[in-house]
Structures are given as structure tokens and as C-alpha cells.
Amino acid sequence: MRKFFLIVLVTVISGLSLTACVSGSGNAPVKAVEDYLDALVKKDEARLSTLSCGEWEDDALLELDSFQAVTTRLDGLACSQTGSDGDTALVLCNGKIIATYNDEDQELDLSVRTYEVVQEGGEWLVCGVR
């Protein structure tokens, strides 16, 4: 009986460990988008560039430029991977970017675009929107 209990315990612990590893790597595209949006609202150009694929970097910097005259913050950010298209992970976020100018807030709904995230050099990078 003791041996059986030990085998069951080891099996459960092993299963939980494997689940943690799989879910951690599955969240990498989501984390990439969350980090990208954080860099965007903090106006961190260098970080935004490193979180963008080469093909998307110019677009990311244009988006950053559009926020230069306003104060920005994220509100209620929650992202999840909604699927994939070949090697591209699709990530949808809920929440808003709030842009403030002269004490007036403008809310930009994040759920209107789906982020395309690809793996380059072992890193997940934002590489477009739909």
C-alpha cells in the first residue's frame, strides 16, 4: 500500500511539473505583447524595438511617435492567445491605453486589434496586428 501511494505521489508531482513547463512556454507570446504594450505606454523606444520583429519595428516606432505629446497608461490589461496562423501566434488583449492631453483622457480600446507574434532568434516578438 505504501509503495502504491509513493508511486501515485511521484506521478502526480511529475504531471504537475510538466504542466507548469508547458503552460510557461505557452504564455510567452502573451507576455511578449504585454511587454510590448508596457514599453509603448512608457515610451521606451529601445525596449519597444527589441520586442518587435524586424519587419514590424518601423511601424512600432511610428505608433510610439503618435503618443509623444500625451501622457499614456494601461488600464485593465488582460491578454490571451486566441489561436495561431502557421508559425504566428495570435494574441488578443482587453483593456485600454488611456492617453491624457490637457487633463482630457482619450481611451483606446485594445480589443479592436489582434497582435501577431512570431519567434525570431528564440524570442517571441510582436510582428503586426490584424
Predicted regions span which residues?
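Bacterial N-terminal signal peptides that target proteins for export
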Residues: M1-V8
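C-terminal motif of bacterial Sec signal peptides marking the signal peptidase cleavage site
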Residues: S17-A20
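Bacterial signal peptide processing site
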Residues: V22-G24
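Amphipathic alpha-helical repeat elements characteristic of tetratricopeptide repeat
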Residues: G26-V30
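Short solvent-exposed beta->alpha transition segments
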Residues: K31, K42-N94, A99-Y101
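Hydrophobic pocket/interface hotspot
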Residues: Y36, R47-L48, V117
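Exposed beta-sheet edge and beta->alpha loop/turn motif
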Residues: G86-R130
